[in-house]
């Protein structure tokens, strides 16, 4: 990471400009992101400004505005050419040093310690862990929430493999939260724990930096009781899944959740989804299958998976697992989310789609598309924990919901290109967008209708 003092000196020496604290924060942020994205020094970032005729004669105020506006054009070249940039929508936070003591995730998963609530001390889930890891330390606690409040954790401990086996007391079932003014697909979430043994640079769970490890409920039978009551009021089938705050299958060889979930949902008028980045399907292949049980995989180019999705299965491993599950009689689905606007994104995502349709039989239950998006806290956490990652140095701006998103012209190009590529192979699989507004949805040809999303996916 280049030194702030050095940049300040270079600006003063080369450009004859002394910045106040707030001005320097903005300039440093822009210069830092350009240097990271393009892998160049601060000298190279400032070089074009030194050559600007008459710059040295500008007043200090004009120099600052010219410097900032020029760096904005370098930082957001495509958007600068397509539209006027509202500077209020540029997130210019203070540049921070990355963590030196960040916990590194290394497969295979091995828990560091298990905390178990008293009410579930005799649970099968704890027995499963102890059988797999006979020397693991186990500590009995009353409530995990109370433990976390009295034992403070830092972001550097975020991915420590601490396991909390708990009795879930909240709502097992809830609607998938959808951003205001964005279209919902009618999805329901089955709350099957919190946290993930994988470590993706873009994962929004990083915002919950005060809680390390994984929370796993031991009382899944209470969910079945709850869902039996809930389902009596359903007027039509729903889609429900477990992959919102955890990976559905990453630890299935230990938790064995699938062994009870799949038989339970086979007889229900729902589409039940298990969402994963793993190839942990051994338990599934021993179970009776049904098309209403959908196993879905998140897909990104192989190079992106290697760089940004630590400890996950490779792209090839995911597709091989999907083919086995499909051949066993389960439904399969795929999520291109987040799609990252890389330099050669058309080629990279096109290759993923080519490989997908060469290995599996169409049609699929569904395919969703969603471009990279995050709140400001997530970008900061990613910079601290993944200093080698450049994904947030693409052309991302704060939207109405205060999330960082690509501008409409980039999103629309991505969605249309990928939809067209899928349609070359497959006219039947329903394609939908995740967390997008109606205006964007209606501009893309080939998606399920924006006014009938839920019914189109059931």
List the model feature ranges, each with a label.
Residues 247-249, 279-282, 293-312, 338-342, ...:
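Conserved radical SAM core fold
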Residues 308-309, 340-345, 365-402, 438-446:
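Flexible glycine/acidic-rich beta-alpha junction loops that bind and position SAM and/or redox cofactors
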Residues 255, 297, 345-361, 388-393, ...:
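Short, electropositive alpha-helical surface patch
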Residues 318-378, 421-433:
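Conserved C-terminal portion of the radical SAM core fold
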Residues 164-182, 201-296, 324:
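Conserved Radical SAM active-site core
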Residues 390-458:
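C-terminal accessory regions of radical SAM enzymes
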Residues 1-185:
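Flexible, acidic/Gly-rich N-terminal and inter-domain linker regions that tether
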Residues 113, 237-241, 271-273, 292-296, ...:
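Structural preference for beta-strand elements that scaffold enzyme active sites
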């Amino acid at each position: 990471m280049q030194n702030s003092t050095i940049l300040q000196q270079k600006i003063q020496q080369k450009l004859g400009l002394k910045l106040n604290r707030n001005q320097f924060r903005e300039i440093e942020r822009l210069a830092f992101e350009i240097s990271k994205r393009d892998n160049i020094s601060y000298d190279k970032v400032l070089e074009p400004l030194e050559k600007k005729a008459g710059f040295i004669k500008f007043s200090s105020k004009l120099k600052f505005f010219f410097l900032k506006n020029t760096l904005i054009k370098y930082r957001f070249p495509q958007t600068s050419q397509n539209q006027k940039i509202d500077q209020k929508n540029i997130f210019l936070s203070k540049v921070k040093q990355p963590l030196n003591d960040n916990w590194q995730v290394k497969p295979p998963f091995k828990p560091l310690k298990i905390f178990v609530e008293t009410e579930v001390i005799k649970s099968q889930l704890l027995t499963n862990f102890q059988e797999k890891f006979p020397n693991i330390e186990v500590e009995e606690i009353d409530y995990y929430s109370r433990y976390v409040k009295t034992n403070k954790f830092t972001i550097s401990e975020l991915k420590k493999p601490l396991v909390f086996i708990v009795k879930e007391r909240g709502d097992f079932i809830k609607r998938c939260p959808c951003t205001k003014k964005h279209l919902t697909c009618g999805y329901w979430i089955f709350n099957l724990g919190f946290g993930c043994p994988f470590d993706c640079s873009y994962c929004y769970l990083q915002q919950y930096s005060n809680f390390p490890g994984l929370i796993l409920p031991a009382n899944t039978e209470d969910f079945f009781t709850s869902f039996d009551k809930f389902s009596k009021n359903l007027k039509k089938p729903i889609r429900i899944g477990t992959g919102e705050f955890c990976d559905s299958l990453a630890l299935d060889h230990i938790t064995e959740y699938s062994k009870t979930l799949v038989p339970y949902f086979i007889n229900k008028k729902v589409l039940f989804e298990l969402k994963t980045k793993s190839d942990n399907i051994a338990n599934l292949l021993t179970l009776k299958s049904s098309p209403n049980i959908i196993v879905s995989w998140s897909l990104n180019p192989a190079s992106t998976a290697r760089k940004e999705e630590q400890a996950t299965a490779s792209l090839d491993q995911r597709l091989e697992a999907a083919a086995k599950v499909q051949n066993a009689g389960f439904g399969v689905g795929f999520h291109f989310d987040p799609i990252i606007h890389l330099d050669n994104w058309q080629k990279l995502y096109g290759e993923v789609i080519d490989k997908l349709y060469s290995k599996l039989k169409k049609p699929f239950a569904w395919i969703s598309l969603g471009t990279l998006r995050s709140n400001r806290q997530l970008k900061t956490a990613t910079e601290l924990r993944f200093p080698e990652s450049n994904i947030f140095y693409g052309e991302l701006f704060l939207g109405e919901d205060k999330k960082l998103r690509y501008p409409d012209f980039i999103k629309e190009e991505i969605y249309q290109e990928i939809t067209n590529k899928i349609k070359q192979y497959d006219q039947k699989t329903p394609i939908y967008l995740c967390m997008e507004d109606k205006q964007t949805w209606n501009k893309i040809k080939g998606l399920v209708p924006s006014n009938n999303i839920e019914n189109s996916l059931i």
